[in-house]
Amino acid sequence: MNEHEQLVDRAARHAHTVVFLGGLDAGKSTLARATAAFALRIGRSVAYIDADVAEKTVGPPTTVGMKHIRSADDLTLDALAHADALGFVGSTRPQDDLVALIGALQRLRDRARTEGADLLIVDTGGEVSGIAGELLKYYMVDVLEPDLVAGLQRGQELEPIFGIVDRFFGIEIARASVHPDVVKIGRAHV
């Protein structure tokens, strides 16, 4: 098994909440969907939260979207686009309204759990650098209370965030490099 397959296996089999971190075009959404697919195959009840307010998988831009994954058909991009629940942020830049973003994450986390999800997969945006990226990820981890943080990084770009996660939360961190086949598409909305 390569490092990405190991990460998917660990998250799908053992985590209750996994947060995927990485810069732009790191493959977070692809790995999150692979984790959801495998978890579904082994009998887990999965909810997918898309916390990237610009490059959306679940729901429209400027929102946090949540989708229950009940079958493999729910993992197609067309099906994922239709959220089961939304939280409005109002900007494609998370730093513009951090309170709205964190509040939406908390409400959708609670709703997913109430509605029976035993695995919550959180796909985050690519803001990882500087104090703004570090604070954003700190507050996300704080409110989501994951038992696994999965990071896809180029070089050591996530190490400052991993240091914060380790120091303040003591949560398991799974590191992997960005897959060499990841295609950079950039951010068209920002």
Regions found by a protein language model. Give the residues of each.
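Preference for solvent-exposed, low-hydrophobicity sequence contexts
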Residues: 1-13, 20, 143, 147-187
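Conserved lysine of the Walker
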Residues: 28
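Hydrophobic positions on the alpha1 helix immediately C-terminal to the Walker A/P-loop
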Residues: 31, 35
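Nucleotide-state-sensitive switch-loop elements of NTP-binding domains
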Residues: 2-15, 19-21, 43, 47-120, ...
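Conserved P-loop NTPase nucleotide-binding/switch module
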Residues: 119-144
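The conserved Walker
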Residues: 24
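Conserved Switch II/interswitch segment of TRAFAC-class P-loop GTPases
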Residues: 92-103, 124-130, 146-159
